[in-house]
Regions:
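Membrane-proximal helix-turn-helix segments that form the acceptor-binding/catalytic region
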Residues: 1-6, 45-65
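A short, active-site helix/loop in glycosyltransferases that binds the activated sugar's phosphate group
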Residues: 21, 40, 59-83
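Conserved donor-binding/catalytic core segment of Leloir-type glycosyltransferases
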Residues: 104-122, 127-131, 139-142
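Carbohydrate-associated surface elements
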Residues: 68, 84-96
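Active-site proximal beta-strand in glycosyltransferases
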Residues: 12, 23-39
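Nucleotide-activated donor-binding/catalytic signature segment of Leloir-type glycosyltransferases, i.e.
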Residues: 148-178
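Nucleotide-sugar-dependent
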Residues: 167-171, 181-205
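A short helix/loop element that forms part of the nucleotide-sugar donor recognition site in Leloir-type
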Residues: 94-106
Length: 207
């Protein structure tokens, strides 16, 4: 199923779904990147955990994105491991004077913005309470929001804009007043404490 690759210099894997690559692709070196504690996701199966261990033990190097993942990676028993934190594409997110998003014309400021996935580990209760207590602030969410629509009450200062293209994100961030990372530490501590959010650097780059 893999065509056009007699041999690759570096085989980069970032999902347990890539374990088949290790068996099928000839490579000089291979890397598996761990960005989250897979065991912390509710839907992770025992089979997925076994596949991750197999993948981690097969590659030349396992890199992990957060210091808090070090012990988790150690128990995967890799041949070699190294800390490689997230970083921002500054050329993209640090660009100056992006045009104001047209949606913001109908949203009064100040704007508190979240950009990213909204899954079970998102703290919907906290966000709902913040929106209720701070009616003068507009809370804007960008990203796949099917679950958010189920769990958040409709409020005049809560705006779910849905998914936006990656190329458009800097302007939404630049014209917001504060960036949010409302993750549910109380109920998903293992997962949340292992996260080193890329969005944090994107927020910083946009000022």
């Amino acid at each position: 199923w893999v065509r056009g690759f007699d041999e690759v210099d570096l085989l980069y894997c970032d999902s347990v779904a890539h374990v088949g690559w290790i068996k099928d692709i000839v490579r000089r070196k291979s890397v598996y990147r761990v960005t989250d504690c897979l065991a912390g996701f509710q839907k992770t199966t025992p089979v997925a955990l076994e596949l991750e261990k197999e993948l981690a033990g097969s590659v030349d190097l396992v890199v992990y994105a957060a210091r808090s993942l070090e012990d988790y990676v150690k128990q995967l028993m890799p041949k070699s491991m190294a800390y490689l934190p997230n970083a921002v594409n500054y050329a993209h997110f640090g660009q100056q004077s992006c045009a104001r998003p047209p949606e913001y014309d109908a949203i009064p400021g100040p704007i508190a913005l979240y950009v990213g996935a909204m899954d079970v580990w998102f703290d919907y209760r906290l966000l709902d309470e913040a929106a209720a207590r701070l009616p003068e602030i507009s809370f804007v969410l960008i990203g796949p929001d099917a679950l958010a629509k189920q769990r958040l009450r409709a409020r005049p200062n809560l705006h779910l804009l849905g998914k936006r293209e990656y190329r458009e994100l800097p302007r939404y961030l630049q014209h917001a007043d504060v960036g949010l990372i409302p993750f549910d530490v109380a109920n998903h501590s293992e997962l949340v404490r292992s996260i080193h959010p890329l969005k944090l650097y994107e927020y910083f780059a946009c000022g």
